């Protein structure tokens, strides 16, 4: 899932249905309502991933198309993106905790485009490991603006200082 930030706002099925009906009627939902809806969907999907044995992945903290003029001339995905600074460690932990409460937390990989989030992600990983699956919750590899020698070394150094580097999923190339 690629999100600007990871939301977490609890909602009942009735609340989510009301939000859906509101939007389908052409009304605009509030930020709080959007976060409730997104959270409900992410929890539902997480449970399905667990059932199917599929890893859930979160990519966050990227703002896309920030140069409006160039974005309108060249279109999306043409190089006008930037690192975001949304702080959402508490929301990520709450989302994983909600899935863990029902023993339906899937294998999960968490990527933030902001290297300042690495230590926070490292501590989140430790909150949800278990003895059934080594490295059940993983810190994704350094990516995009961090996919270079210094970025990878710094990310793996922080990961090794807070967790077990031997369970790291490894690096990737674009």
Question: Positions of the model-derived regions?
Answer:
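Hydrophobic, well-ordered secondary-structure elements that form the walls
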Residues: 174
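Histidine/acidic residue-rich metal-binding segments in metalloenzymes
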Residues: 1-107, 116-134, 151-170
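Active-site-proximal segments of catalytic enzyme domains
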Residues: 140-142
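Conserved blade-ending motifs and adjacent loop-strand segments that build the rim/top face
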Residues: 144-146
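Glycine-rich, often proline-containing surface loops adjacent to acidic residues and nearby aromatics
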Residues: 136-138
């Amino acid at each position: 899932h690629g999100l600007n930030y990871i939301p977490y706002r609890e909602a009942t099925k009735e609340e989510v249905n009301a939000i859906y009906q509101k939007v389908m009627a052409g009304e605009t939902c509030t930020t709080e309502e959007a976060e409730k809806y997104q959270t409900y969907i992410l929890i539902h999907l997480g449970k399905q991933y667990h059932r199917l044995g599929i890893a859930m992945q979160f990519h966050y903290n990227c703002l896309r198309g920030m140069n409006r003029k160039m974005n309108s001339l060249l279109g999306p995905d043409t190089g006008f993106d930037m690192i975001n600074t949304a702080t959402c460690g508490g929301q990520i932990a709450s989302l994983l905790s909600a899935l863990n409460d029902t023993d339906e937390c899937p294998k999960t990989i968490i990527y933030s485009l902001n290297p300042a989030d690495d230590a926070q992600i490292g501590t989140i990983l430790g909150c949800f490991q278990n003895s059934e699956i080594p490295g059940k919750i993983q810190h994704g590899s350094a990516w995009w603006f961090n996919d270079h020698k210094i970025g990878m070394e710094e990310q793996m150094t922080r990961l090794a200082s807070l967790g077990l580097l031997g369970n790291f999923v490894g690096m990737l190339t674009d």
